[in-house]
């Protein structure tokens, strides 16, 4: 008899968890508190309690080829970086393709998840839900928590003396939807993550002046990388990941600094991170430097104090007549339907084995999916988590002892602090490729490069030096997809397809350019020998 699995949430993590359950022959039921799928990526004009919220202009920071699910490439005519509405369209196509909607109970809130009395032997959970003011309960063999971590706004008002006397408007970035109504105003954005930068750029088009306050500075990275390809298809390769792992930290720091400053010198713009030793997640924004050059945005240090109409900064400068303050200060998270003893959140941190399993449970039948912030796309990350979890639920994969898991949690946390620092925004941070490979190894889906070098050297080279995308984890092992190899070799075609909207005649410019380079090199060689002859 198939095991019954409760999936909490029908966002990205919930949808892929449903599919993985079905793939493994499990019987899932998904509880979604709203009326539709998509989670944080479904824009709504109004902010709703208990639901993630985005602004209307949000575009993905990871490209389509690096973000799609492993056996379902995005349509080739989709843009490389997707507006939230386009990404939601992909999720709808995905859900329809794999017939996932029939497993979802919409407008159903999970009130509690509790161990059954015989949990130590059965591993079962009693899940209490509410729909249309009616409570129901059911017993499940396992639970997958996919409720996200961008719901509870973090506004540290105590860190801003004088906020109580500020006469202007202030709110968390979660409440921001579009620039209407902010025309001609002087606006202070506090926090320079992706949301803060996006909002500052958008408002700067029509505001009188926008200021953005950053405590530690940040690297700003363009979505466009070498030869115009998406940044993550260039940055996230196994070769580059290996270099970042084995080279001395000082060398890695230097490499990252050179790469980040290739676009513009961050020191000149007042953005250089205070501690460059940490691998802080960069801000992905193509407009920040141009808005700074235009003077539409001005970078400021930490806010020291607020008055009725002005902001005083730690460097002693003062900005008068501030109309609006937007706190882009991140989120905290909690699981109100779980007992604290199950998944305890302290200082925005949770102790989970590989960011997924509580280590202390007698039975490994509770898992958190997507509770992580990789330096890459969350979609393939959540998918590999769900693939592993469902195989653990089914008994095809096993977890180590509680002691071993706790040691791993401690060691992983120490490594995270060493790499990323102790900021609240970094508590879920992890390296991307290394983590994907780690999960793939657990389920037997990591490609064997030594074997491939002999069997399929062309593919081996592509896997090691090319973009590390999700298709690679469908080449071997459980869930193998026969289209994976083809998807890997045709990804460039799908990247370029939406860009080539203007027909061009065949041109010999490339060959002429190449010939000129050769002639130039020969000229240098001839000049060198002529100089030797006359000396």
Curated annotation (Swiss-Prot):
UniProt protein name: Dimethylaniline monooxygenase [N-oxide-forming] 2
EC identifiers of the protein: 1.14.13.-
Organism expressing this protein natively: Pongo abelii
InterPro entries: FAD/NAD-bd_sf, Flavin_mOase, Flavin_mOase-like, Flavin_mOase_2, FMO-like
Cell compartment(s), UniProt: Microsome membrane; Endoplasmic reticulum membrane
Membrane-crossing segments per the record: 510-530
GO MF, one annotated term: N,N-dimethylaniline monooxygenase activity
Membrane topology (UniProt): Single-pass membrane protein
SS bond partners: none
Keyword Ubl conjugation assigned: yes
Cofactor names: FAD; Mg(2+)
Residues that bind NADP(+): 60-61, 195-198
PANTHER family cross-referenced by the UniProt entry: DIMETHYLANILINE MONOOXYGENASE
Sites where the protein binds FAD: 9-13, 32, 40-41, 61-62
Gene name of the encoded protein: FMO2
Family note: Belongs to the FMO family.
Highest taxon, organism lineage: Eukaryota
Sites of N-acetylalanine modification: 2
GO cellular component: a single term: endoplasmic reticulum membrane
Keywords carried by this UniProt record: Acetylation, Endoplasmic reticulum, FAD, Flavoprotein, Isopeptide bond, Magnesium, Membrane, Microsome, Monooxygenase, NADP, Oxidoreductase, Transmembrane, Transmembrane helix, Ubl conjugation
Entry keyword annotation includes NADP: yes
Function (record text): Catalyzes the oxidative metabolism of numerous xenobiotics, including mainly therapeutic drugs and insecticides that contain a soft nucleophile, most commonly nitrogen and sulfur and participates to their bioactivation.
Covalent cross-link Glycyl lysine isopeptide (Lys-Gly) (interchain with G-Cter in SUMO), where: 492
Pfam families (UniProt xref): FMO-like
Signal peptide stretch: none
Lineage: Eukaryota, Metazoa, Chordata, Craniata, Vertebrata
């Amino acid at each position: 008899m198939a095991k019954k699995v409760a999936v909490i949430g029908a966002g990205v993590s919930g949808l892929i968890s449903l599919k993985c359950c079905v793939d493994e022959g499990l019987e899932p039921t998904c509880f979604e508190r709203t009326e539709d799928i998509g989670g944080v990526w479904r824009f709504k004009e109004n902010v709703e309690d208990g639901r993630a919220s985005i602004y209307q202009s949000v575009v993905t920071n990871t490209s389509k080829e690096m973000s799609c699910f492993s056996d379902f490439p995005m349509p080739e005519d989709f843009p490389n970086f997707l507006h939230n509405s386009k990404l939601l369209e992909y999720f709808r196509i995905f859900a329809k393709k794999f017939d996932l909607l029939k497993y979802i109970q919409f407008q159903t809130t999970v009130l509690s998840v509790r161990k059954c009395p015989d949990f130590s032997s059965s591993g079962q959970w009693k899940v209490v839900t509410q729909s249309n003011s009616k409570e129901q309960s059911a017993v499940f063999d396992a639970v997958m928590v996919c409720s996200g971590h961008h719901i509870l706004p973090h506004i540290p008002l105590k860190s801003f003396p004088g906020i109580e006397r500020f006469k202007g408007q202030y709110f968390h970035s979660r409440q921001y939807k579009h620039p209407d109504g902010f025309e001609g105003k002087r606006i202070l954005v506090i926090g320079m993550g992706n949301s803060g930068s996006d909002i500052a750029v958008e408002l700067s088009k029509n505001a009188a002046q926008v200021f953005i306050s950053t405590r530690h500075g940040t690297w700003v990275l363009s979505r466009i990388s070498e030869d115009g390809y998406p940044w993550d298809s260039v940055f996230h390769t196994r070769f580059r990941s290996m270099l970042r792992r084995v080279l001395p930290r000082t060398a890695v720091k230097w490499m990252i600094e050179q790469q980040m400053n290739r676009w513009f010198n961050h020191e000149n713009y007042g953005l250089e991170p205070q501690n460059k030793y940490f691998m802080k997640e960069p801000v992905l924004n193509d407009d920040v430097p141009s808005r700074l050059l235009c003077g539409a945005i001005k970078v400021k240090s930490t806010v020291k104090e607020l008055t009725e109409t002005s902001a005083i900064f730690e460097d002693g400068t003062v900005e008068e007549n501030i109309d609006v303050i937007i706190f882009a200060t991140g989120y905290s998270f909690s699981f109100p339907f779980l007992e604290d003893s199950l998944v305890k959140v302290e200082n925005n941190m949770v102790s989970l084995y590989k960011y997924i399993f509580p280590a202390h449970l007698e039975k490994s039948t509770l898992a958190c999916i997507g509770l992580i912030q990789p330096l890459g796309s969350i979609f393939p990350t959540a998918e590999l988590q769900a693939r592993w979890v469902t195989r653990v639920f089914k008994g095809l994969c096993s977890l180590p002892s509680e002691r071993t898991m706790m040691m791993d949690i401690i060691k992983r946390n120490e490594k995270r602090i060493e790499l990323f620092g102790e900021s609240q925004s970094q508590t879920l941070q992890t390296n991307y490729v290394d983590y994907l490979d780690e999960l793939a190894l657990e389920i037997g889906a990591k490609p064997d490069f030594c074997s491939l070098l002999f069997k399929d050297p062309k593919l081996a080279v592509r896997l090691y030096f090319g973009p590390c995308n999700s298709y690679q984890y469908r080449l071997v092992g459980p869930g193998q997809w026969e289209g994976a190899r083809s998807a890997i070799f045709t990804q460039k075609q799908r990247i370029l397809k939406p860009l080539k909207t203007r027909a061009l005649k065949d041109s010999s410019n490339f060959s002429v350019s190449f010939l000129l380079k050769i002639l130039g090199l020969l000229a240098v060689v001839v000049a060198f020998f002529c100089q030797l002859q006359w000396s």
